[in-house]
Amino acid sequence: MVYAAGSVRDIPVRALRLCGLTWTGQSLWYSDAMNDEIVALDPASGEVLRRIPCPGVRTDLTATGGNLVQVAGEHRALRTIDPDSGQTVGVRGNPRPGHVLCGLEATRHGLWTGYEDLRVIDLRDPEDLRLITTFQTRRPVAGVTASDRYLAYADYRGATINLIDLDDGAEVLSVTVHGNPTGIAWDGTLIWYCDFATFQLRAIEVPGIAGS
């Protein structure tokens, strides 16, 4: 099914290369590869709450165990950062070395890693990165998020956000959005995305995903 969604909330941000996006329960965090930083903001007011320097920002961002995890560096490693101190507390290698890791999301299921070149999203054990399962995607993966029932990924060039049913791995919905989505995040009601084209964080409502 194909569906077109207009944004219900737009937040302009001071960023030149919007990459990653994650929701921590109260704040949206986004990463900017041009300014090499990770930024927290209040989605209600748009107020910036914190800026953390992060050299080598590449693509997506997630939060787990009270820390942030950013895809960073030439080899797209998983860099774990303490959001309070801004210090790097750990680095793990790209689970598929040499491939284009773009999407990253930590959920109760495990750690999701999405690859643009392979068109796959892997679910991995967050402790040792052991592969649990793999979902094939129809489009290149730019960013990843998940609810309890659905896995969602962004296609930057196709300007779509696509939903996969976690029960059977079928792609059930393709949502056409404004701009070019990169990082995406689900806040329990809305799917937010980084619009690379207009330097904004934008939110859409997707039928059937709210509360899922």
Named regions from a protein language model:
Residues 1-4:
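Blade/loop signatures of beta-propeller domains
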Residues 6-12, 47-52, 87-94, 127-135, ...:
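A short beta-strand motif characteristic of beta-propeller blades
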Residues 12-24, 55-65, 95-108, 114-115, ...:
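Beta-rich, blade/repeat-based domains predominating
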Residues 30-35, 70-75, 112-117, 153-157, ...:
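Conserved beta-strand positions in repeat-built beta-propeller and related beta-rich domains
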Residues 39, 79, 119-122, 162, ...:
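WD40 beta-propeller blade core
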Residues 42-46, 82-86, 123-127, 165-169, ...:
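Short loop/turn segments that connect beta-strands within beta-propeller blades
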Residues 147-191:
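Ankyrin-repeat and related helical/solenoid repeat scaffolds used for protein-protein interactions
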Residues 181-212:
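Blade-level signature of beta-propeller repeat domains, shared across WD40, Kelch, NHL, RCC1
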